[in-house]
Amino acid sequence: MAKKLKLELELDYDFDLIGICSTYSDYRLCWGINQALNLKLESIDDYCLENKKEEDDKFSFYEYFDEQTEESFYLVKNQSNNYKKLIPEQDKIDYFIIIKDNYEIEIDDLVTKLRTLDSVLTAFSFNVNDLKSKSNLIF
């Protein structure tokens, strides 16, 4: 009789997460973030989450890879084209900044800089592991 093997994959949540509240459109907010943090976030294809019952949810998505530090920065809108939330338990947050492979940047300093922008009402850092919908942030 053949044995069944079960493969379990553990997702990697090793990234920093900042939530931003803003009434600005994504491209205007992105411009302000680029100026304040000396980044070059660029719009790429929308981040899609498959939805079995309805049309796929698409979230505005920006990306920047710093070749010098090898850090990846992402700006993603928390609300889709279908008015669904990427992270429903944080429904007051309008955007998330995700930083992967961060070994140099002090997140609290980054949050402080973001809070000085006219386009940002407030910003918070989050522990990714505290979020129920954290798997939506794996891309």
Question: Could you tell me what each predicted segment is?
Answer:
Residues 4-12, 83-91:
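Short, flexible, solvent-exposed loop/turn segments with mixed acidic/basic and small polar residues
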Residues 7-26:
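Terminal, regulation- and interaction-focused segments at domain boundaries
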Residues 13, 42, 134-135:
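Terminal intrinsically disordered, low-complexity, charge-rich regions
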Residues 26-40:
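Amphipathic alpha-helical segments
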Residues 46-80, 85:
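Surface-exposed, low-hydrophobicity interaction/linker segments
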